[in-house]
Amino acid sequence: MASKCVRLLLLLSWVAGPEVLSDILRPSCASGWFNYRSHCYGYFRKLRNWSHAELECQSYGNGSHLASVLNPKEASVISKYITGYQRSLPVWIGLHDPQKNASWQWIDGSTNQYRPWSPRTKSEARHCTEMNPKDKFLTWNKNGCTKRQHFLCKYRP
C-alpha cells in the first residue's frame, strides 16, 4: 500500500507540478485559521489586552503564540486576510519589549529583524506592537500593552 502511495505522489508531481503537490501535502489548520508557508494563522475579532491575547493564542495549542511577521510577503498575505474582515481597528502581533529598554523580541522566539514601524508611532511607555490599519496593516505601531484590541495568532502544524 505504501509503495502505491509513493508511486501516486511521484506521478502527481510529474504530471501536475510542484504547486499542486504542495497543495495536496499542505498541513491542515484548525477550522477558521488560514495557511501560509507551512504556518497557520488565526485572526480573532475579540478585544483583549496584549497579555490576554497571548494567553488565548497559547490556549489553542500546537505551540500557538501571537504572530511573528517576518518579511514583507508574509505581511502582505496577512494584510489581505485581515482587510477581508475589517479595515479600521489595530491588531496585536507578538513583537514586544518585555524589559522596557527598546530590546524588541518576538514572543515565539523568532529572531528576524523585520520591523516596518509606522513613521507616526510613538515610543514612550509603549512596549507592545500592533498592525496599523491606516497603512492596510503593513506598518506597525508601538502601543500600551493594556489596550484591548483584535489579535493574530500563529502556529506551525
UniProtKB/Swiss-Prot annotation:
GO terms for biological process: response to bacterium. Gene3D superfamilies: Mannose-Binding Protein A, subunit A. SUPFAM superfamilies: C-type lectin-like. GO terms for molecular function: heparin binding; mannan binding; signaling receptor activity. The keyword Glycoprotein applies. Residues 36-154 form the C-type lectin domain. One of its GO terms (cellular component) is cytoplasm. It is found in: Secreted. Disulfide bonds join C29-C40, C57-C153, C128-C145. Glycans are attached at N49, N62, N101. Transmembrane segments: none annotated. It holds the Pfam family Lectin_C. A carbohydrate binds at D97, P98, Q99, K100, N101, K134, D135, K136. The keyword Transmembrane helix does not apply. Keywords: Disulfide bond, Glycoprotein, Lectin, Secreted, Signal. Residues 1-22 form the signal peptide. Calcium-independent lectin displaying mannose-binding specificity and able to maintain carbohydrate recognition activity in an acidic environment. May be involved in inflammatory and metaplastic responses of the gastrointestinal epithelium. This is Regenerating islet-derived protein 4. It comes from Rattus norvegicus.
